[in-house]
């Protein structure tokens, strides 16, 4: 059964799925994803469409552009949270960001941060909240730019809107909610002043034409977030992503990954600056 497949034995099933998708003139590389992630996506869509067998679902994909788009969208990494890894954000807030800001006190250049898979925007907005709070305490004007990218236009649209339910704000204090959000019923909207230093754009980390988001012009990031993304891909693709984001860092820049992805960075020439923080620098 495909739903318990080993890629070596079920490559044919993946190729059949790819062929069904391509009937709509859409190309997608299913082989770059970790097989368990593809299985999970297929299983979810089969449940949603009440397909009992794999060939039945493939037939639906071949006939329905809507379902094809839904399946492809299910491959987009869309889950995120505000302040998702508390230890990571605590180290950034208490140590790394204040240090970087102090170094730039007498400089005209801005602090540059890249959120490389921003989903609905929780990650870049979390960073902006910290930056605004630090600068407010220091009585300094904002001098930073956050480049927030995602390969999904749907996710970027949602991030730019900045609308969240009460349940999505669980990791935020009431003070932060009242200061940075406008509330209407159970919906909360990011205030315009928090968006002013964030640049949202669609960007594919596998795009060979660009080494960093075109909107950033030249890369040169002090911090790059590549968190909770790598484990969705196979080793070869992980290496490509790490090389791209690593090359976009300034000297002694920081690469931030998810809690479960720390060992991946260690095996690719990075060292963790604080234990279990998920914050790395190049060796």
Task: Give the predicted meaning of each segment.
Residues 239-251:
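A short glycine-rich, Lys/Arg-flanked "PGG" loop and its adjoining helix->strand segment in the class I
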Residues 223, 265-283:
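Core SAM-dependent methyltransferase catalytic element
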Residues 251-259:
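Conserved beta-strand signature within the Rossmann-like core of class I S-adenosyl-L-methionine
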Residues 120-138:
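Conserved SAM-binding loop of SAM-dependent methyltransferases across substrates and taxa
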